[in-house]
UniProtKB/Swiss-Prot annotation:
Main subcellular localisation: membrane
InterPro entries, A to Z: SLC41_membr_dom, SLC41_membr_dom_sf, SLC41A1-3
Keyword Repeat among record annotations: yes
Protein name as annotated: Solute carrier family 41 member 2
Positions in the Extracellular compartment: 1-162, 217-245, 304-313, 369-376, 428-469, 520-543
Reactions that this protein is recorded to catalyse: Mg(2+)(in) = Mg(2+)(out); Mn(2+)(in) = Mn(2+)(out); Co(2+)(in) = Co(2+)(out); Ni(2+)(in) = Ni(2+)(out)
UniProt organism field: Homo sapiens
One BP annotation, GO: magnesium ion transport
Amino acid sequence: MTNSKGRSITDKTSGGPSSGGGFVDWTLRLNTIQSDKFLNLLLSMVPVIYQKNQEDRHKKANGIWQDGLSTAVQTFSNRSEQHMEYHSFSEQSFHANNGHASSSCSQKYDDYANYNYCDGRETSETTAMLQDEDISSDGDEDAIVEVTPKLPKESSGIMALQILVPFLLAGFGTVSAGMVLDIVQHWEVFRKVTEVFILVPALLGLKGNLEMTLASRLSTAVNIGKMDSPIEKWNLIIGNLALKQVQATVVGFLAAVAAIILGWIPEGKYYLDHSILLCSSSVATAFIASLLQGIIMVGVIVGSKKTGINPDNVATPIAASFGDLITLAILAWISQGLYSCLETYYYISPLVGVFFLALTPIWIIIAAKHPATRTVLHSGWEPVITAMVISSIGGLILDTTVSDPNLVGIVVYTPVINGIGGNLVAIQASRISTYLHLHSIPGELPDEPKGCYYPFRTFFGPGVNNKSAQVLLLLVIPGHLIFLYTIHLMKSGHTSLTIIFIVVYLFGAVLQVFTLLWIADWMVHHFWRKGKDPDSFSIPYLTALGDLLGTALLALSFHFLWLIGDRDGDVGD
């Protein structure tokens, strides 16, 4: 049945005595809704995201929805004057007042790529899709579906503009880290205790293991409406920061152990004082850097929410903007300081490590008190530790390459190629994760083409995630050209910019990001199908793979350049 407004009206009755034989006076209800301009204004100002497939977010308690909006506001979400698109589907509705579950069928989506989300502002990523559902007090269930023209989706240009500024900011942060590493590689601690080079990718990878995971997790919480309440928001923030400090301390210690083992295997020599220095430096660096970056990240995400910018586009690259620089500077400073105290004040190094390790129980208690992080505290160690091991293998490649005087020029470019690849794939993983949180439940995927995840499906499909993969891949070449030229202008490094070097370097960078985006498409959906949160599981693996691929491809590139005789510059001098 269709009314004068072009809405399709479906009436289901529960057979209650007050249902009036199954007929409802829709004229009065629609007129009341259409006259409520004040609620319309409020609804357009408040960032709200509705998720129809999570029934617990739609239970009615004392006439008020758990989302914080009344039933009238929920019903009024079909605003014809704003020409918003509503996708028609049937789902099971739960009546909290009588416990009656109506007949239902599985969700049918019109188009996998047509689901959008936003915070109600024009500057946000897309427009909110508020589904209609009205549950009357007498047990009637009525569904109103409005058919209106489609709202234009986020274009590739708008997406690129939102990503570009934080991407460049993060890129210049990695360039700064590369130049710092190029300087500190000549410090005494880096020359005498070469295992510190193995620590570099593992500790810089903490931004992928922890900072980007935190950014993606909080971005998803913002986009699905879990941070609308101030109490809930601060519970999430405090719990996640405490969890991150626990993970940073443990991962920092394990990274030092991995560096000691990987350094001892090829040389066959073991020094106890060097091992203590590595453990103390790694734990202290991980703790301090993680705390500073976590505070910055919370500010970025809260600010993004208030300004209407999609945090998925900006949070993860900003998480790495100064992360590499801060982490590397702290590592170099602490390592050199502890190394200078080895002979005269030998007890300082173990005391530093014991102090930061002793703080771990405090952070565990805080994180365990918050339900949002209690689960991750018990089950979120596998990806973090595995990612640390993968990054440490990349560090072993870096340590071996730097030991060759002909390939010392690799140092300044390692944080750049690793950081850029990790930033781009983290953006994609965060966007896919948010999409899945909005349009399906863990363990189930939205309707989409079946089969294996081959590259053509990742980059040339019709969905919004395919579009973002194209945009991110197109940013690789211009971004790296800017960063290469910046390094050249700063007269940093040991490598001149020749045409052959630029071509080989860009080929390795594009291959790295192409592979990472392809893997991300499969990995995020894989963890979601297994019922695991992709924000906590996929990003550590992806950024660690970015470190390993970036370091390996860069080492191969320098070997190739040396073999073909590209020595007109000062490669390896």
